[in-house]
């Protein structure tokens, strides 16, 4: 018996209410069974020749669960999950998307993912409203930023601080 996606809602910039609970933040390609992944991709990724705008975020309802999802700003990579600004975990992205799954859903479809600390971040979240803007998600105390790279920002802050770096004016130049 194949389980199907019951509904798919394009939220755009509309906010989504999330109940308190334990959630997994990861790329949905790691969680959805193969037979559902292609159906989901047809709904999320638009072909330019169809003349439709692709949704940037939305909610999928399946098996009595609501799964919020959003596109990353720059595609694949590794992204931090922050609580009150402090990094509490990270997750990998291979499909340019990230989602907030109820842990029960992940336990049913991909329980091994809960052990993958670089592909998924599991955390308890209070009730809140998920907001999305250009690849960034905020839900009260929990935030994911994909529109800038934390490591790049740290590197930029440190640029020029190396005492051995004389700005390219070495005797060898």
Segments the model singles out, each with a brief description of its role:
Residues 1-173:
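Intrinsically disordered, low-complexity acidic regions enriched in Pro/Ser/Thr
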